[in-house]
Swiss-Prot record:
Protein name: Chitinase-like protein 1
Tissue: Mostly expressed in seedlings shoots and roots, stems, and flowers, and, to a lower extent, in flowers, mature leaves and roots.
Pfam families for the chain: Glyco_hydro_19
Organism: Arabidopsis thaliana (Mouse-ear cress)
Keywords per UniProt: Developmental protein, Disulfide bond, Ethylene signaling pathway, Glycoprotein, Secreted, Signal
Induction: Repressed after wounding or treatment with ethylene.
SUPFAM superfamilies: Lysozyme-like
Renumbered residue ranges of the record's region Disordered: 297-321
Function statement: No chitinase activity. Essential for normal plant growth and development. Regulates cell expansion extent and differentiation at least in roots and hypocotyls. Prevents lignin accumulation in the pith. May modulate ethylene-mediated regulation during development. Probably required to establish thermotolerance acclimation. Plays a role for controlled anisotropic cell expansion in the regulation of waving during root gravitropism and thigmotropism. Involved in the root system architecture adaptation to multiple environmental conditions such as nitrate.
């Protein structure tokens, strides 16, 4: 017969209590997300190192609210705007949910998520703005004024892609969306990623705000070329520059997000207006989101004025124009 002494029982009880205390303190690695009065309770820090229902990762809607979206794009539904009633907060959040598990707005903690929102939406605003110097509310308040190119000069059909992304008869691949995409090969690639027939129906992007935001986030998250980083990986610090990148003055900075998206249209040409306009939107959005532009870094990290372009244009650009 096995005899258990009272001292052993006390030790076992203490061990059990200690284990429960560890679980309560968050040292159990399988704690589920709890909610108290509708708010998430996380005992392991802001986020876990993987995406799981057992982790405490916040989503974009946890820190980016509808009132902030309205502040950033306050003039988008004024009568003179060209996409009145098209863009809205819920369409953005629905689109973003597809990419949150891939790190969009959920990489590196809450502050990094907020900064990425300001950066991404700063790009969006600068590319869809109808603001000008004396516009009501200032030139930075007019983002999401457009959802399409108003007077396209061509159909943007590149026949060199006819075997992989052939142009559909009658289709026109002019700029559409929140980060406007151009050319048949871009519509084809985006359509494959988003499971939408954009090659045959590029007009879907100007008809559906969620799809338009998804196409923009896809462009932000996806390298234009396999050997290159995405704008997302540059901004959040996932990308490690090579020696050639360093010599070309490219680094994990906001400036390099402009470079990888727009190349020589914006970068490597000194302090030009297209570049400064994007920077101004980013800083303005940081201020409106309550972060402050001092967190944006020095000017040489914001600028791409002296960077060599990632993709010099010898053929139609595969990036947004």
């Amino acid at each position: 017969m096995v005899t258990i002494r009272s001292g052993s029982i006390v030790i076992l009880v203490l061990l059990a209590v200690s284990f429960l205390a560890l679980v309560a303190n968050g040292e159990d690695k399988t704690i589920k997300v709890k909610k108290v009065r509708g708010n998430k309770v996380c005992t392991q820090g802001w986020e876990c190192s993987w995406w799981s229902k057992y982790c405490c990762n916040q989503t974009i809607s946890d820190y980016f609210q509808v009132y902030q979206f309205e502040q950033l794009f306050s003039k988008r539904n004024t009568p003179i705007a060209h996409a009145v009633g098209f863009w809205d907060y819920q369409s953005f959040i629905t689109a973003a949910a597809l990419f949150e598990p891939l790190g969009f707005g959920t990489t590196g903690g809450k502050l990094m998520g907020q900064k990425e929102m300001a950066a991404f939406l700063g790009h969006v605003a600068s590319k869809t703005s109808c603001g000008y110097g004396v516009a009501t509310g200032g030139p930075l308040a007019w983002g999401l004024c457009y959802n399409r190119e108003m007077s396209p000069m061509q159909s943007y059909c590149d026949e060199s892609w006819k075997f992989k992304y052939p142009c559909s008869p009658g289709a026109e691949y002019y700029g559409r969306g929140a980060l406007p995409i151009y050319w048949n090969f871009n519509y084809g690639a985006a359509g494959e990623a988003l499971k939408a027939d954009l090659l045959n129906h590029p007009e879907y992007i100007e008809q559906n705000a969620t799809l338009a935001f998804q196409a923009a986030i896809w462009r932000w998250m996806t390298p234009i070329k396999r050997a290159q980083p995405s704008a997302h990986d540059i901004f959040v610090g996932n990308w490690k520059p090579t020696k050639n990148d360093t010599l070309s003055k490219r680094g994990p900075t906001f400036g390099s997000t402009m470079n990888v998206l727009y190349g020589e249209y914006t970068c490597g040409q000194g302090s030009i207006d297209p570049m400064n306009n994007i920077i101004s939107h980013y800083l303005y959005f940081l201020d409106l989101m309550g972060i402050g532009r001092e967190d944006a870094g020095p000017n040489d990290e914001l600028s791409c004025a002296e960077q060599k372009p990632f993709n010099p244009s010898t053929v139609p650009s595969s990036s947004s124009s």
